[in-house]
Every structure is written in C-alpha cells, then in structure tokens.
Amino acid sequence: MQIIEIREPEQADFKQERQIAVGIDFGTTNSLIAIAANRQVKVIKSIDDKELIPTTIDFTSNNFTIGNNKGLRSIKRLFGKTLKEILNTPALFSLVKDYLDVNSSELKLNFANKQLRVPEIAAEIFIYLKNQAEEQLKTNLTKAVITVPAHFNDAARGEVMLAAKIAGFEVLRLIAEPTAAAYAYGLNKNQKGCYLVYDLGGGTFDVSILNIQEGIFQVIATNGDNMLGGNDIDVVITQYLCNKFDLPNSIDTLQLAKKAKETLTYKDSFNNDNVSINKQILEQLILPLVERTINIAQECLEQAGNPNIDGVILVGGATRIPLIKDELYKAFKIDILSDIDPDKAVVWGAALQAENLIAPHTNSLLIDVAPLSLGMELYGGIVEKIIMHNTPIPISVVKEFTTYVDNQTGIQFHILQGEREMAADCRSLARFELKGLPPMKAGYIRAEVTFSIDADGILSVSAYEKISNTSHAIEVKPNHGIDKTEIDIMLENAYKNAKIDYTTRLLQEAVIEAEALIFSIERAIAELTILSSESEISIINSLLDNIKEAVHARDWILINNSIKEFKSKIKKSIDTKFNIIINDLLKGKNINQIK
C-alpha cells in the first residue's frame, strides 16, 4: 500500500522562509508536538530528549513543571466538565480532589497559589510544547492543528481551543484523533476505500469508519468507550499479580504490571524476583477487554451501513499487544495497518494537516461527523431533529417554524442533543428567545432557524423572523461536558427505548393535532355567523366531545380514529359551505384567511 513518506530526515529544513504550523496531540497520558515540511514529519523532542511528554503539571518553587509525572494528571478528562459532574464521578474526583475548590460555583482548581479554570492550567502544557518547538526550530510558532477525541462535545472542544489560545496559538483546525491517524497513513494519495480506525489509548477507546475518495476523508460513523483503555489492562494484570503472588494493591504493583505488559508484547514470558507471567496467561486475562473493543468496532460498522472495509488502522500504544492484532484479523479478515508508531500516528496526521492548511495549494479535505443528533423542542415537548447523528460536518441546515397561539410576541428556542423523541429525555444545550415579534394570529409568524456546525464541530444556531426582520444568533457552548460514555449511553437508551419513544411521540403529536382542531373548530363556531343550524352545531360538538374524551384517555389510536370520524361525518352531514370552511381549517389555514 502506498503511503505518505513519513520520516525524520536529518537534512530536512523545517524552518524555511514560509508559514509554519504545528500539529499537537494533547493526550490523556502523553502529549506530542510535530511539524511537517514537504510531507516529511518531525516529532519535536523535549529538553530531556523525549518525544512522548507526560501530560502532567506540577507547581513547585513558584514555577510550573511539565512532564515529570508528578502533580495533576489526565487534565484532558476535565475539559467540558462542570463542578457537579466532577463531584458525582469518582474517577474524575480522584484526579482533582487535592486541588478542587468545592466552595466555588464553577469548576476551579487551587493551583499555583490561585484559583484556576481547566483551560488556564491546560494552557501551561500547550505553552511548554510551544516553547520546546520554538527552541528547536529557532522561530516563533503561532498556528496549530490540534487533535481531540472523536466524541468531544462543543464544551470540551471550546475549552481545548481556549487553552491553546491562551498559550498563543491560532487554532487552524480541531480534528478527530482517528481521522488524524488515517491521514497520517497517506490514504489521501491515490487511495480509495473504507477504513476502520481502531484507537486504544491509555484511558479511552475510539473507533471510526472513514471513506476515502479522491483525496476526501469522510468520517461516516464513530463509536467508543470512555472507560476502556490500556489502563484497564494494567488493572487486570495488577489484580492477577496481587492474587497469585500475594502482592499489595499498590502503585508499585501497578508499575510492575505495566512492565510485564510491555515485555510480553515482544517476549513469551516476564520474570523478576517476585513474579512470573507468560504470554498465554496475559492473553487469557485481557481477552474479555479485547472482545469488548471488537464488539464496539462491529457496532460502528453497523452504524455505517456495514460497508466493505479495506483495512484496519491501529492507533494507541496499547495496540502493540499481539492479541489485539490477532483478534482484529479474526473478526474482519483484512489488512491490519500498524507500520506507523501507534503512539505517533495522531500527531503525524495533525502535522500533515497543518502543513496542508497553510500550503498554497491544498489537495485534501477532512470531513468529520456529528456524534449525536441536534434539534429543537417543539410544542408538547417533542424533539424536532435538525442535524442527525453521524451527519458529515461542516453542515448548515435551515428549517421554518411558526407560532402555535395567537398574539405571540416572542418565540423561545430550546436546543437539544440526543437520540430520544421527547425533550425530557435529551440533553439541554442552550436556550434563547426571539423577541419583539408583531402580535398576530397563530400560524402567521414564520421563523427561519439555521443550525450550523463548523469544521471544528462547534454548533451555532440563528433564528430570523421575516415580517419584523428580527434575528438572534448564538454559538452554543453547553454548560455541561459530554464524554464518550454519555454518548454511548444516549445511543444505547435511544435503541432500547425506540418503541416507547415512538409511541410517546405519536401520542403527543396526536394530542397536539386534536387540540389544534378543537381550538379552530370551536373558534369558527363562535366567530362565523354563517352557522345558523343548531343541528349542525350539535353534530360538531358531539364529534368534538369524542375527540376530547380520546385525548383524556391518552390513547393515540383512539385520538386518530376520532379525528378521522370527525372529518368523515363532517363531509356527509354538514352544510356544503361550512364544510369547505372546516376543510380549510383542517388544512392549517387561519380563521381570518377564510372569513
């Protein structure tokens, strides 16, 4: 397979007289920074000659210390989170318990003798990466492409961008980590087909399906597990060592487990003075975890429509374990691509995309997807989905909405995220109101609502009312972060509750239709002097009573049947002229349009 030439040439000039942009992989465990020139990639090392810089930050002697494996760890997991979420999630609380300011109304950490927000602390890591690169390249760096997990939501993405901005970077693009890894393989160069990216990092698992046609990278589905990664493998091995050799469940035993795992990626056994474990035992221990990742990958393929895939791209240090390659091949019977260092694939892709974005003539395009559906709450609590799950982005969708009651001078918009049919079951992202509308009859006002997601996955919503020329726009920045686990739960709940949700929606829609019909007909009876026959009015009221009883019974089939009965008997029993009026009302016309 032809791939982009990715090497670290001794003679390459990475500080030419041209624009320079770097790629940054801000990881949970380690971070990397790289630069590409003429499609050749160089990972920039730290001052102590490390390419993988631990994503840790400490504050001692009035200075920030980055990468010494002390202090605050895994800050990436805090992006987009609220104080409430931290307090209610033991795994997150354990990360920050020594720094958390529980008296604050928002998430702040007591760090560097100050109360700092997560982006302010993360910015120090970006500054460290920036300084290391500037020192080696002997030039100022201001532009970067930064990778994020495929399931990062708007809040998390926004905080990553803010941290980078504080550090002095202009973020050219946020790209999903699996997409960056695929880009690193040079699949945009005379390659066509569908590829599965299997990304098993230290703390998370991501899988994406990408379609590549004529230099266009399109993500068509994503899936993952935020609580599954190489760290879980370490825990399983640690538990085995504790039970088998009567060792304490301590940091030292965990480090021993990690060493055993790494050794068994290239040897058949691991032995030291205290323990011994062989490859066969390791594989028995971790097989259930590996099978979970395979199942998630297969679910992702189903979401994508079960396309024929041409290869599996491995990303993340944990994929060095031979069992993972073996099980992937058994499951998919296709090429397993691992010829790029899995720890570097993401940052290489980011660096190549950075060069591509600043080059005079770009020759490739990355298209990501929305991880969850986005929509609005309608009357009755129904969700109108506007951008669907796994829709390619960037995208802009326009829909028209109207008022439900007379003399509304404002329309409230409730933006939602999720797969369920009712607003109460989805995640609230934002609310805003379009004010100053002219008081008019229901149905006259027309508001155009535009949902737009940019290439970085940031959502903006605007509304425009034509008659009053009133508009309002917001960039949706949710107050709550949403990680992959929550997304998976949302999708799973949507699947499990699909039938219930569908029935609930049908009922609510039937109730809304019935209430609108009752309102319109009763108003017509009161306002139109053409109705002189008491017998006609009696027939109509009797039919309306049937509809009201059906609504009270909360039976959508009964409601629909009573509405059908109303329409049928009206045609047969009512005066022709009034029949025409009723039919116009049933078609949604306003009473004033047909007086």
UniProtKB/Swiss-Prot annotation:
Annotated Pfam families: HSP70 (PF00012)
SUPFAM superfamilies on file: Actin-like ATPase domain, Heat shock protein 70kD (HSP70), C-terminal subdomain, Heat shock protein 70kD (HSP70), peptide-binding domain
GO molecular function, one term: ATP-dependent protein folding chaperone
Keywords: ATP-binding, Chaperone, Nucleotide-binding
Cross-referenced Gene3D superfamilies: 1.20.1270.10, 3.30.420.40, Actin, Chain A, domain 4, Substrate Binding Domain Of DNAk, Chain A, domain 1
Keyword ATP-binding recorded: yes
Gene Ontology biological process terms from the UniProt entry: iron-sulfur cluster assembly
InterPro entries xrefs: ATPase_NBD, Heat_shock_70_CS, HSP70_C_sf, HSP70_peptide-bd_sf, Hsp_70_fam, ISC_FeS_clus_asmbl_HscA
Record has Membrane as a keyword: no
Cited HAMAP family: HscA
PANTHER family: HEAT SHOCK PROTEIN 70KDA
Protein family according to the UniProt entry: Belongs to the heat shock protein 70 family.
Task of the protein: Chaperone involved in the maturation of iron-sulfur cluster-containing proteins. Has a low intrinsic ATPase activity which is markedly stimulated by HscB.
NCBIfam families given in the database record: PRK01433.1
Protein name: Chaperone protein HscA homolog
